[in-house]
Amino acid sequence: MAKRVQVVLNEDVLSLGRDGDMVEVAPGYARNFLLPYGKAVPVTPAVMKQVEHRRAKEAERQAALKQEALAFRTALDTIGRFTVKKQTGDDDVLFGTVTNGDVAEVIEEATKKEVDRRDITVPDIHRTGNYKVSVKLHSEVTAEINLEVVSY
């Protein structure tokens, strides 16, 4: 039975784990790859203390980001309705569609805060009217906004 060594990862390693994880690996893997390339360090009490400190700071940072996302969701709720103007043809059918990029621009104009278009989920919109759009602000915070599509 081969002896295993414990190391703490300094960065994400695809087959092992994420930054800060303590993992057991074969001694040769640690000695020949992880340690020389700076991807891991051997486990010592000092390293464990650093890992705990880093995890606490990361938890604080995540809590602050969540609070910021909650405040932004409240701001979006107070605005109420966002309006997108699109060119239409007969029977209020849009030329094209409303994309998540269009919604991101409208939110940015109204709030002066940038929202990544990839975090916006827009239903298929091909007509004028009112729609519900989902905006992911944080991994645990999602806002539902009212989107009004009008012709110009």
From Swiss-Prot:
Record-level GO cellular component terms = ribonucleoprotein complex; ribosome
**Presence of the UniProt keyword Nucleus in the record:** no
Any one Pfam family here would be: Ribosomal_L9_C
UniProt KW keywords:
Ribonucleoprotein, Ribosomal protein, RNA-binding, rRNA-binding
> Recorded GO terms, molecular function?
rRNA binding; structural constituent of ribosome
Top-level lineage group: Bacteria
Q: Which InterPro entries match?
A: Ribosomal_bL9, Ribosomal_bL9/RNase_H1_N, Ribosomal_bL9_bac/chp, Ribosomal_bL9_C, Ribosomal_bL9_C_sf, Ribosomal_bL9_N, Ribosomal_bL9_N_sf
Q: Name one GO biological process term.
A: translation
> Which family does the UniProt entry place this protein in?
Belongs to the bacterial ribosomal protein bL9 family.
NCBIfam families, per database record: L9
Function, as annotated, reads:
Binds to the 23S rRNA.
UniProt name for this protein? Large ribosomal subunit protein bL9
UniProt organism field: Synechococcus sp. (strain WH7803)
Gene this protein is translated from: rplI
